[in-house]
């Protein structure tokens, strides 16, 4: 129900903002085959009517191939031809066409997120209308109770003075939107709302001036109060969807140390890095752009790229991607891509594309709303004319028309979905699950396939020592003494999971990409990967093993081998059982090695497991399933899962996930147990049932109430009471969801079988 608004500053900008064709062409990106993509920011896009208006306007340009509006990002993505019949096209016309449609467009540039002023304004408007409505109602009670004429007139004037500023301040969202739509030859949901509120106040003021017995100031203010609640909920939930992309953008480094050809170094912004530039990356810094290692050796956290739970060693000629964290040594990197074409930018683009796809759910509702507006106006007009010409009482005709407009106000319809979402979100929160996206529950109820990431989702994401093959009794003590000097995940797991008292070393050196080295007299001890500890001729045992291996050596001869795996998340087995029992298909999509993924799938009884997937391949798998008509719930935790979380029909992440993973997900569960997934699906299905009931109640109310209003049997006051009552009924029905989890018959059937204690080993 959110619609277009424009202020005077925006209107002025339409006539002053201009870009040359060359500026626009430089701001767009080549796609090949003579096509370019242009991204534009359009801040005043708010509803499905805005989307269809802009897209239709752009597609009238002969050189525009596709146009898509992302409602969440308030961005327009346009693909256009560079040439038509050997003549260059003018892409600046794209901005002009958007401006002509009544919207302010400018070239998109990433920037830090600003505070949500619209949300604050909406909350303040709710407070103003919420203060005015009950106070006017209290005055109305005295009038209804039979106050004398002088007291009645005084109360009416007081009500008028309270209602006027409330209507001006709280109603400006609807009035501006309605005016903007009408002056461009369109209607939207705010048009009948604005007409209803204005007519109700005008008729009430007329009655007050002429000492009438009744006034309906409370009706107009109450309408605004209920409608603003629905609009605010919609706005808050939509803006939360942007948090993931903002967080991912903050992950990218802002600058890098450039190595000049003469060997000197200077710090430059990431945007200034060109392909072929050499940059220095110290330990603890993130890789700013995609590139190839020129010199140096280090361990990188590549979780953003592959989802690997363990750091990966890189050396000369290794390819690295932007966003990876350099853990140990210094590197010199030759850039192969500029920042806007790097992996991080690609992930952000994938997430925005997925969010744009979600807008179709809102479009369906807004398209229905475009039909509602003219029908309501026509109904009120016909009622007015019929009563005026047939009855001859034009005052009564006006009251009937106002009553029809009030009684058909979409308050109940507007609250049918958001109120259930809020109650369901509260119920899930009590279960340790947070809902972040307004449409997430609706989409979760439609789920028929659940795709899990492995590391950090099905498992806890922390390494666990599972086996030690020692050739020397003191090996564990030596290894623990060495491992205590490193923050490597496997070193920490070794220290945590061994109980032997460590042997102390005076000096321990950490070799980037290799491991730890220490001397004890004439002996050299090494702990790390096989090649580092024993030389390149040593053959590790992890090639086809589900375990990670660390080798301890003395003077190049192995003393012990330590094997690590990941622990299954508590409740993982029960969760898979319950999902299977509910008829949902389960699969694993992971960046880990296929052998490791297969091992976890076998432990959980999951038939389909895909390993060694990149973020893009995870997205493609979700899209493939969507193409087959499946409704995919993606459950993941890593930064590399963020695009798939955004591309899936709906997504969940544990609270232990990366910041980006949590922000990209529609739902986040704070409990350690994985049975939060079937719990959430159970509540979502129940809430979907209540939403359908609320729609039935709201439609049933209109079917019964509209004929009564047309017949003149309902005054504007009665119409306002009926409208409020319908809203209360809808809210009360939604509250039935409270305590849902306490009724065992509502739960997804629990599977019987494997114990939660089954391990991944």
UniProtKB/Swiss-Prot annotation:
One of its GO terms (biological process) is nitrogen fixation. Disulfide bonds: none annotated. Residues 36-106 form the HMA domain. GO terms for cellular component: plasma membrane. It is found in: Cell membrane. A metal cation binds at residues 47, 50. The keyword Iron-sulfur does not apply. Residues 1-120, 178-184, 239-367, 416-691, 736-761 are cytoplasmic. Its EC number is 7.2.2.-. Its main location: membrane. The chain crosses the membrane at residues 121-142, 156-177, 185-205, 218-238, 368-390, 396-415, 692-711, 717-735. Residues 143-155, 206-217, 391-395, 712-716 are extracellular. It comes from the Bacteria. The active site is at residue 453. SUPFAM superfamilies: Calcium ATPase, transduction domain A, Calcium ATPase, transmembrane domain M, HAD-like, HMA, heavy metal-associated domain. One of its GO terms (molecular function) is ATP hydrolysis activity. Keywords: ATP-binding, Cell membrane, Magnesium, Membrane, Metal-binding, Nitrogen fixation, Nucleotide-binding, Phosphoprotein, Translocase, Transmembrane, Transmembrane helix. It is a multi-pass membrane protein. FixI is a pump of a specific cation involved in symbiotic nitrogen fixation. The four proteins FixG, FixH, FixI, and FixS may participate in a membrane-bound complex coupling the FixI cation pump with a redox process catalyzed by FixG. Belongs to the cation transport ATPase (P-type) (TC 3.A.3) family. Type IB subfamily. NCBIfam families: ATPase-IB1_Cu, ATPase-IB2_Cd, ATPase-IB_hvy, ATPase_P-type. PANTHER family: P-TYPE CATION-TRANSPORTING ATPASE. This is Nitrogen fixation protein FixI. It comes from Rhizobium leguminosarum bv. viciae.
């Amino acid at each position: 129900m959110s619609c277009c608004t424009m202020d005077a500053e925006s209107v002025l900008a339409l006539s002053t903002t201009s870009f040359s064709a060359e500026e626009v062409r430089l701001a767009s990106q080549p796609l090949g085959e003579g096509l370019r993509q242009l991204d534009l920011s359009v801040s005043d896009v708010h509803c499905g009517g805005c989307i269809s208006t802009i897209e239709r306007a752009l597609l009238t340009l002969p050189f525009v191939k596709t146009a898509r509006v992302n409602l969440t990002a308030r961005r327009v993505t346009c693909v256009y031809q560079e040439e038509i019949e050997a003549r260059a096209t003018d892409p600046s016309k794209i901005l002009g066409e958007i401006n002509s449609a009544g919207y302010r467009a400018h070239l998109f540039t990433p920037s830090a997120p600003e505070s949500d002023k619209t949300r604050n304004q909406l909350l303040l408007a709710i407070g103003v209308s919420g203060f005015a409505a009950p106070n006017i109602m209290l005055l109305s009670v005295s009038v209804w109770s039979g106050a004398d004429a002088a007291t009645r007139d005084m109360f009416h004037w007081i009500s008028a003075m309270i209602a006027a500023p409330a209507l001006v301040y709280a109603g400006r969202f609807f009035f501006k939107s309605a005016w903007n739509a009408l002056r461009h030859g369109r209607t939207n949901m705010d048009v009948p709302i604005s007409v209803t509120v204005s007519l109700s106040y005008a008729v009430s003021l007329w009655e007050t001036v002429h000492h009438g017995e009744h006034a309906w100031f409370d009706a107009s203010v109450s309408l605004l109060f209920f409608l603003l609640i629905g609009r605010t909920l919609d706005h808050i939930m939509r803006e939360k969807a942007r948090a993931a992309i903002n967080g991912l953008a903050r992950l990218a480094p802002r600058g890098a140390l450039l190595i000049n050809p003469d060997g000197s170094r200077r710090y430059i912004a990431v945007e200034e890095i060109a392909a072929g530039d050499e940059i220095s990356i110290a330990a603890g810094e993130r890789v700013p752009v995609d590139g190839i290692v020129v010199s140096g050796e280090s361990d990188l956290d590549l979780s953003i790229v592959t989802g690997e739970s363990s750091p990966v060693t890189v050396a000369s000629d290794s390819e690295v991607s932007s966003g990876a964290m350099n853990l140990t040594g210094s590197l010199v990197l030759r850039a192969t891509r500029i920042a806007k074409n790097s992996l991080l930018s690609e992930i952000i683009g994938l997430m925005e594309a997925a969010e744009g796809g979600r807008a179709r759910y809102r479009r369906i509702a807004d398209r229905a709303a475009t039909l509602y507006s003219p029908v309501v106006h026509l109904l009120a007009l016909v009622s007015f004319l019929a009563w005026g010409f047939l009855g001859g009482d034009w005052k009564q005709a006006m009251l009937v028309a106002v009553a029809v407009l009030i009684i058909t106000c979409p308050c109940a319809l507007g609250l049918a979905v958001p109120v259930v979402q809020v109650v369901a979100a509260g119920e899930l929160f009590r279960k340790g699950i947070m809902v972040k996206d307004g449409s997430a529950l609706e989409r979760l109820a439609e789920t028929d396939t659940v795709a899990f990431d492995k590391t950090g989702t099905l498992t806890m994401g922390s390494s666990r020592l599972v086996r030690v093959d020692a050739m020397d009794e003191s090996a564990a003590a030596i290894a623990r003494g060495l491992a205590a000097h490193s923050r490597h995940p496997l070193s920490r797991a070794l220290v945590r999971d061994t109980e032997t008292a460590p042997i102390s070393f005076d000096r321990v050196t950490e070799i980037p990409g290799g491991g730890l080295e220490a001397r004890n007299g004439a002996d050299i001890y090494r702990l790390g990967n096989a090649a580092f500890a024993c030389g390149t001729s040593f053959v590790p045992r992890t090639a086809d093993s589900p375990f990670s291996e660390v080798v301890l050596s003395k003077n190049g001869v192995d003393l012990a081998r330590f094997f690590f795996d990941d622990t299954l998340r508590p409740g993982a087995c029960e969760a898979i059982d319950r999902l299977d029992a509910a008829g949902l298909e389960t699969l694993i999509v992971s960046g880990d090695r296929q052998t490791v993924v297969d091992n976890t799938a076998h432990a959980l009884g999951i038939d389909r497991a895909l390993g060694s997937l990149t973020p893009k391949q995870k997205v493609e798998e979700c899209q493939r399933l969507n193409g087959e008509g499946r409704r995919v719930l993606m459950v993941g935790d890593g930064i590399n899962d963020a695009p798939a979380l955004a591309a899936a029909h709906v997504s969940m992440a544990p609270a232990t996930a990366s910041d980006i993973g949590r922000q990209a997900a529609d739902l986040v569960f704070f409990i350690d147990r994985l049975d939060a997934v079937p719990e959430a699906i159970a509540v979502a299905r129940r809430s979907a049932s209540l939403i359908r009931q609320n729609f039935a109640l709201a439609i049933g109310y209109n079917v019964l109430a509209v004929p009564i209003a047309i017949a003149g049997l309902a005054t504007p006051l009665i119409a306002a009471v009926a409208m409020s009552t319908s809203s209360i009924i809808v809210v009360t029905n939604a509250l039935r969801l409270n305590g849902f989890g306490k009724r065992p018959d509502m739960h997804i059937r629990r599977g019987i079988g494997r114990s939660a204690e089954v391990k991944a080993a």
